[in-house]
Every structure is written in structure tokens, then in C-alpha cells.
A protein has these predicted regions:
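PLP-dependent class I/II
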Residues: 1-230
Length: 230
């Protein structure tokens, strides 16, 4: 759900049809694992509903991440769901990875206790505003350099812009060889296919750390490479 335009389509569709998920789970007797690490990075309110919010008979296990909203170095997330299912997950963790770093767990626990719910949501608002500003800067750079060379939709959440390169059937060589030589770091769309060897005309650009000047320079270089490829 972090792929720019792809995610935007999913949000619109989900708002109208997400209730189908729990209904199908009930009809065919299966569980839903809702993996949504960018949920708290939605740029517009009200936020899209979750499967968990619609769960009435304990069929949804939801996973969230503190890494996206506090610090990536923490490498810690949390599960929400029916207690019997969560208890089984805990038993599995105890005989596999043990658990996430105790130190980082204590840090986050103390921080959340100090903030409370209000402080946590205020922090989320600040994080969202930061990424919204970053997103807008990347959209400006994309519109300046890639308008006639690629297609994209403004992402509704997250920290990535999903771009389709016109006239390029596979971006693997363009991104992993030519772009790298120009010090432009992007991810070719094929990396997100079930079969990563399948060709893809898409690339993913991150706006999490780059400055507007870096975004502008990167897309200028990408535009030059696309023109050469065409």
C-alpha cells in the first residue's frame, strides 16, 4: 500500500468495499492478517478504515510498525487481535526469535506512557506534516522533469512515489546500472513483483530523507537517462 498511485487507488476502493473482507472471512472461515505499516502516515483525514475496525468475530490480526513513525533503527512493531491468536504468536516468538530488543521495547514503553494518547497523536500529526511537505516537494520535481516521460499519482500515504516510465518496458538496467552510475538511488518496479525477474516499467522513489534540491537534481538526471533510453 506504499506505492504511490497504486495505493491511492486502493484507498478509494477500500473506503467503499473493505467490508467485503470480513464478510468473506466469515463466509469461508479464514483469518485476515492486516499488514499496514504506513497507516499512521495518511495525509488526509478521515483515515481509511481498517479491517480490524470492522472485525466482529475475532478474525483479524493487525500488524503495525513503530519504525515508520518513531525511528527506523528501533525495528519494532506491534500486533493487535484476538487474545487466543496473539497468545499463539507469542509462543512462536519465544521459540524462534525470542523477542525484539528489550532496550528498545523499554524506550518505547516509557515514551508512550509519558506522551499518553494525546501526545502520541500530536506526534503523528507532526510526522505526517513532515512527509506531506516531502511528498509535495517530490511532486514538484517530478512535474518539472518527468511530466512528458512518466506517469504517477500523488501518494495518499507513506514515503514513496510510484512512477511509470513511458516507453520503457523494463526499468531494471536503467535503475540498477545507469541511474546508479549517476548517483540516483531508486528501486526498479520488478523488485515488488512476486517473480522479480518479470519486466516492469515502474520505479519507486523515496522522499523520506532527500532535500528538495536533491529531488530536483535526481529527477533531472533520471529524465536525461530516460531520454537516452528512448
Amino acid at each position: 500500500m506504499d506505492h504511490g498511485g497504486a495505493r491511492e487507488w486502493m484507498v478509494v476502493d477500500a473506503a467503499e468495499h473493505m467490508e467485503i473482507g470480513p464478510a468473506l472471512a466469515r463466509k469461508y472461515d479464514f483469518l485476515i492478517i492486516e499488514d499496514d505499516p504506513y497507516y499512521f502516515l495518511q495525509f488526509e483525514k478521515p483515515w481509511a478504515p481498517t479491517f480490524l475496525s470492522m472485525d466482529v468475530d475475532g478474525r483479524v490480526i493487525r500488524t503495525d510498525s513503530f519504525s515508520k513513525i518513531l525511528s527506523s533503527g528501533l525495528r519494532i512493531g506491534f500486533l493487535t487481535g484476538p487474545k487466543p491468536l496473539i497468545d499463539r504468536v507469542i509462543l512462536h516468538i519465544q521459540v524462534s526469535t525470542m523477542h525484539t530488543s528489550t532496550f528498545t521495547q523499554i524506550m518505547i514503553s516509557q515514551l508512550l506512557q509519558q506522551w499518553g494518547e494525546t501526545g502520541f497523536l500530536e506526534h503523528i500529526d507532526r510526522v505526517v506534516e513532515f512527509y506531506r511537505t516531502q511528498r509535495d516537494a517530490m511532486l514538484i520535481a517530478a512535474d518539472k522533469w518527468l511530466k512528458d516521460l512518466a506517469e504517477w499519482y500523488p501518494p495518499a500515504a507513506g514515503m514513496f512515489l510510484w512512477i511509470k516510465i513511458k516507453g520503457v518496458s523494463d526499468t531494471q538496467q536503467l535503475i540498477m546500472e545507469k541511474a546508479l552510475q549517476k548517483e540516483v538511488l531508486l528501486v526498479p518496479g520488478g523488485a515488488f513483483n512476486i517473480n522479480s525477474s518479470e519486466p516492469s516499467s515502474y520505479v519507486r522513489a523515496s522522499f523520506s530523507l532527500c532535500s528538495p534540491a536533491q529531488m530536483n537534481l535526481a529527477f533531472k538526471r533520471l529524465a536525461d537517462l530516460i531520454k537516452e533510453a528512448l
